[in-house]
Structure formats: C-alpha cells, structure tokens
Amino acid sequence: MVKLNLGCGWRNFGKDWIHIDRGDYPHLDYKDITNLEFEDNSVDLIYASHVIEYFDINEVKEVLREWRRVLKPGGELRVAVPDFEAMNILYHNGKVKLKDIIGPLYGRMPMGGKMIYHKTTYDYESLYLLLYGLAYNEIERYDWRHYDVHRQNDDHSQAYLNPKGDKDKGTLISLNVRARK
C-alpha cells in the first residue's frame, strides 16, 4: 500500500509512509507536494494535515488535481484544515478571544528563510465544493479517532480550543474531510 504524508513537517508516521515536505527534516523522502514524482493511479492514500490553506484558490485546484492524478481509482484523500465555522462559532459565542483563533486562521510558519501564511480558509461547504468540482467523490467528514495513524501521531487534525488542547472537553477546530478518486 502506497501512503503519502504531504506537508508532514517534523511528523514522522513511520516506514510504511512516504513523507513529503519542503522543510529540512531527516525522515523526508521528497520535497515537492505540488509535483509528485509518482505514476498516475499509483497511490492508495494521501494525507495532508493543515497544508492546503497555504495555497490560494487557484493554486490549490492545481495541487488537488495533481494529488488526484496519482491516486488509484478508489484511492483516499484525507485533508485537515483549520475549521473557519467552528472557530467563528466559538468566537461569536464568547468562548474564545480573537487572539485564540488568529494563529489557526492565518497560520505563520518559517519556510525557506521567510515566513509563510495561510492564503485561504475553509468551512465544510467550501471544501466539499472544491473537492467535488475536481471530481473527487464520497466526500465526508472523518473522525481522527477512527484511524490508528492519527491516534498514534498527534497532529493538527486533533486541534482543539476551549480549552486549548483538551480532546475530551474542547471544541475541534480542525475540519477533517476525506474523499475518494
């Protein structure tokens, strides 16, 4: 089974995953998540946690087309992005302050000697329509708790606020969506 962890950063999911990120980490197999060096229809699973928001709406369409190209028919794409709707509800209801959601909404990460920021944000409807428009199907939310890899590796698909980091009492602020080719 060919499994890609795209935009993985320092997170190493183990030897049975291929890790791709522009960063400089010893476990990386490749650098470019926008131009994958794989044959058409050769990948079973793509996982990308809090990475597509770093592309603008035109760039992300090209990236998702590239990812779809390498997925096998029936292959699964799992994406996690900051959940605009969840954070907006928390803020509107006075559960969090603006300072609590600025980071997850706008991002800020050093990359290649400069700081990069999120270029867009998503709610379920906008992410659904984006994926549907690019011929992905069986689009639905997923619960990170249902997958061993996510239970064993703490990543942004498990981002919670109110209280921050509390997976039992907090509100999930990661929009976790899966789709199939």
Language model regions located:
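Conserved class I S-adenosyl-L-methionine
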Residues: V2-G9
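Short catalytic micro-motifs in class I SAM-dependent methyltransferases
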Residues: H50-Y54
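S-adenosyl-L-methionine-dependent methyltransferase catalytic module, highlighting the catalytic core
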Residues: E59-E66, V70-K72, E76-R180
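Anionic group-transfer/hydrolysis microenvironments
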Residues: G7, G23, P82
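Adenosine-cofactor binding site in Rossmann-like domains, unifying the SAM/SAH pocket
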Residues: W10-D40, D143-W144, V149-K164
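GHKL-family ATP-binding catalytic core of two-component histidine kinases
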Residues: E37-E39, D56, D123
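Local beta-strand N-terminus motif with an aromatic residue
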Residues: V43-D44
